[in-house]
């Protein structure tokens, strides 16, 4: 509801941040971290996410015909960021855990990452890649978290952490 009326007809994941939808930043981070298979758990009315990452042959023909090669490359690269799978969440939505569980058959026994494009991480080495490296080094699950104020504690999931010898890693 924070982004209404902008999200009445468009998913918040598709709201633009500079020149591309917010969700594309997350997908680019996943791709830059070496992951090719991406599963989107979507809800009713979010077909624009699928359309965005699908190839667009008609648009490509128009751009090619107009000699707009830079835009053509951007459009093509978007659909080449990974192999995309889409699962529609059942109604009513039953929370994040249920949404993740819906991808179980596609994920199988593989390691996986859950990204929510609510925050965009701007790191020289992608945040997800750093998390993968920590997970492999520690042989453990890894969460990216941030400090929040009292208001945020009412709106977000909260974790209690203990420091370790690495200032970037808490237990």
Protein language model regions, located:
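Conserved beta-loop-beta/alpha segment of the NTase-like Rossmann-fold superfamily
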Residues: 59-62, 69-166
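N-terminal glycine-rich phosphate-binding loop and ensuing alpha1 helix
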Residues: 1-69, 84, 89-91, 125-130
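Conserved FAD/dinucleotide-binding core of flavoprotein oxidoreductases
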Residues: 170-171
